[in-house]
Structure formats: C-alpha cells, structure tokens
A protein has these predicted regions:
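Short hydrophobic helices that act as membrane-entry/anchoring signals
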Residues: 3-18, 77, 81, 85, ...
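Soluble catalytic domains of membrane acyltransferases
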Residues: 20-194
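A contiguous, mid-protein "functional segment" used to position or interact
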Residues: 182-219
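Short, highly charged C-terminal tails/helix-capping segments
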Residues: 214-240
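C-terminal non-catalytic accessory extensions
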Residues: 242-245
Length: 245
C-alpha cells in the first residue's frame, strides 16, 4: 500500500511537476513470472526511477547502490526505501560474497534484483563506461536470468527533459558466453572471475550500441530552455553527511 502511494507521488512529481518524459520500448522482453536480474547502463541519479518506470509494480525491484550517495538526507532514505529496496554498498565494506548472499535472498523471494555494472556514473553522454564483473558473478551464482536494460538522457536533467530506455531480450551467462559448457567454476576461483568477466564484456557489447542509438532521441536543440538544470542534475548526487564522515 505505502509502496503504491509513494510511487504515485513520485510519478506526479517527476512527470507532472518536473515534466520528465520517458520513451520506453521492449517491455515484452520482461520475463512473465519469477525472478530476474536487471543489468542496466548508469547515467545519473534518475536511472533507478527510469528502471522502475519500465518494470511492473510487482514483483518489487531491489537495487545494489552506493550507501553514501543515497543516504544523504532522511527524506531521501525514506523515498528510496519506499519505492524500491536498496542494498547499500559502503566504502571499505563487505565483499562480493555478502552482495551475492543479499541477491540470493532477493531472487529467492521472487523479486527483481537491479545492478548497474558500471558501478558509478561514468563515461560521456551517449556512451557506457567500463563494466565491472560483480553483476555477472551474482547472475552466475544465483542462476537468475539477465535482462539487459539500456537508457539515455539522464546524465543532465532539466524541466521537460526527454529520456529513453529499451529492454532487451532476457539472457543468461551461458547465453552471453556461448562456448561455456555450463559447469560452474568453484566460487571464488580465478576461473569463476574469468567467466564473469567474459559475460560482463558480452553484456557491455550488447548494451553499448543500444545506448548510442537511444542518445540522439533525448538530445534537445541548443536553444531549448534548460530550467533548473544544475539543481535537478545534482539533486540526488550532492555530498551528504555520510560522505563527510
């Protein structure tokens, strides 16, 4: 109940007041039932809202994200927790095993686990940054289907900003690494990390061109008014109390 009400309020603010516009394609590629892992390109703080906008209300989405970047004010923490669960990552905190355990708990309950393999906002507009293998390690150990999710237009925000997203057909680690025989390497081994890196490179090769295709759809003319550009772009990215501790 609170989740639906919070999402309705967020939709009103983002799409009614600020007038963000999102063009989403490929919803037919979402698995019809059961859990899955979303591997999404990362452009800005609006990205989780773009993902939630594209997904059905149920099952609920859980995000692996930066704790210091999110919990910068009590109201932000409440908003994020109400809209979708957050599994926070802290500097010098737990390793991949703990994140895999959390991801297993999420998918084990039939929910959606979302991770952005870039790990941070990086790369120029319209291009993805380097991908890290953590998401594919989680996919490998949980067996969750992987839904590639491309988006563009969230790196710079202003009133009426156009954005675009595209959901690609679901795949698996074996689908990304065609010559893998399907025998899982020992957890924590070099072989497992190498396999995850190969799957990560394959996912980046899929998402990169789609992000480049979507980017022109979000570009406004140079003389287009960009009201509140600085405030909106940095709305959720300002340093907070946890960054200073």
């Amino acid at each position: 109940m609170f989740y639906r009400l919070t999402w309705l309020f967020a939709r009103f603010m983002l799409f009614g007041v600020v007038r963000f516009r999102i063009e989403t394609a490929g919803r037919e590629h979402l698995p019809s039932s059961g859990y899955f892992l979303v591997g999404a390109a990362h452009r800005g703080w609006m990205d989780p809202f773009v993902v939630i906008h594209a997904l059905p209300t149920e099952p609920r989405a859980w995000f692996l994200g930066s704790g210091p970047s999110t919990f910068t004010a009590p109201w932000r923490e409440v908003l994020i927790r109400r809209l979708g669960g957050l599994l926070p990552v802290w500097r010098g905190g737990v390793g991949i095993d703990k994140h895999v355990e959390s991801a297993r708990a999420v998918v084990g309950n039939g929910a959606v686990f979302v991770q952005m393999p870039e790990g941070t906002v990086s790369g120029p507009a319209g291009r993805i940054g380097p991908f890290r293998p953590g998401a594919m390690l989680i996919a490998l150990r949980t067996g969750a289907p992987i839904v590639p999710f491309a988006m563009a237009g969230t790196e710079e925000l202003y009133m009426g900003r156009r954005m675009a997203s595209r959901i690609l057909p679901a795949t698996t680690v074996s689908g990304l690494v065609s010559d893998w025989g399907g025998v899982r390497p020992e957890e924590g081994s070099r072989e497992e990390l190498d396999l995850a890196r190969r799957a990560t490179d394959a996912l980046a090769a899929i998402l990169g061109p789609v992000v480049e295709q979507l980017h022109p759809l979000t570009v406004d003319p140079p003389d287009h008014p960009r009201r509140f550009r600085r405030k909106l772009t940095w709305f959720f990215l300002r340093p907070g109390r946890l960054d200073r501790e």
